[in-house]
């Protein structure tokens, strides 16, 4: 956890029990689920809330992967990254923070997630670090993936 930077954003690499990653699709761009922590909210609860609001999924086994220092030219802050296990995925629903807006969702292999991310050079190290954490806490078992899991699965309403 950063000690000298405010945490302004929290994102999660959300794994299904079969080892895929859930990506949120906004305007054709695949991203991690997450958002801004509320001042009163524990950081892990921010990710749980955002996962429910943006992707209608319930998560647990939330563990810190690390953080990225961001300098947007006006402020310097941290984006915290977690790995978590998806326990349940419901139908797509509008994000309560953006009335009328429903995100697309897709389940992909970690290798595919790296290719789809708009995060440039940090994409692969981020996913590899998340996998390492998920293995440590026993919720990543990709070595047992059936062939059909290697294909993308777009989640419909």
Model regions: which residues?
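Unchanged
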Residues: 37-60, 65-125
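Entry beta-strands of beta-propeller and related beta-repeat scaffolds
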Residues: 20-21
């Amino acid at each position: 956890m950063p000690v000298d930077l405010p945490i302004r954003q929290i994102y999660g690499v959300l794994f299904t029990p079969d080892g895929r990653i859930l990506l949120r699709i906004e305007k054709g761009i695949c991203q991690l689920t997450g958002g801004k922590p509320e001042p009163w909210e524990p950081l892990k609860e921010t990710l749980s809330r955002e996962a429910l609001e943006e992707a209608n999924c319930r998560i647990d086994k939330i563990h810190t992967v690390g953080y990225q220092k961001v300098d947007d030219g006006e402020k310097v802050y941290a984006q915290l990254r977690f790995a978590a296990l998806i326990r349940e995925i419901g139908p797509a629903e509008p994000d309560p923070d953006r009335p009328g807006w429903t995100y697309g969702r897709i389940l992909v292999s970690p290798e595919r997630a790296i290719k789809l991310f708009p995060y440039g050079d940090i994409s692969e190290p981020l996913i590899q670090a998340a996998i390492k954490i998920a293995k440590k806490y026993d919720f990543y078992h990709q070595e047992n993936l059936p062939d059909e899991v290697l294909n993308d699965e777009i989640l419909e309403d």
